[in-house]
Amino acid sequence: LFRSYPMEDQSWINFRLDAISRVVDQITKAVKADGKAISAAVFPGPSMAKKMVRQDWGNWSLDAYFPMIYNGFYYEGPEWIGRSVQESVKTVDGRAKVYAGLMFPDIKNDFEKALDEAFDNGASGVSFFDGPSDEYLHQFKAYLDKKGLKTE
């Protein structure tokens, strides 16, 4: 049925992509039937997520996505945040909001640059994983005020 490496067989890849998407679709329908919004923290960039973990999240019907754009995990600088956000926003094409999920220790030394990369490439907002200190939260508030961005 499969070649010696099923993970490289396109029919197996499609099976995995479809299986995960079907589960997400069932959950999404149940949540939305109850009048609630639904979101998920997903792997970064739709193309990377498809390849790495078989998440075809660009085709899901969620209200918001929080791609985990942990640039340090992939040995990338803050510019990678912008590229990942841009791909994500383009893929969802206005159907949902994209909030860049940032690993705080990865961006601590390039805090404002990382935020610029997210917002300048279309992120509706950001979420912090392994959260910032109060000092950085104050810097974040000042950044939002300076850029004329509202807080929700």
Predicted features, each with a name:
Residues F2-L62, M68-Y75:
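Polysaccharide-binding and catalytic clefts of secreted carbohydrate-active enzymes
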Residues S61-E152:
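Substrate-binding cleft of secreted/luminal carbohydrate-active enzymes
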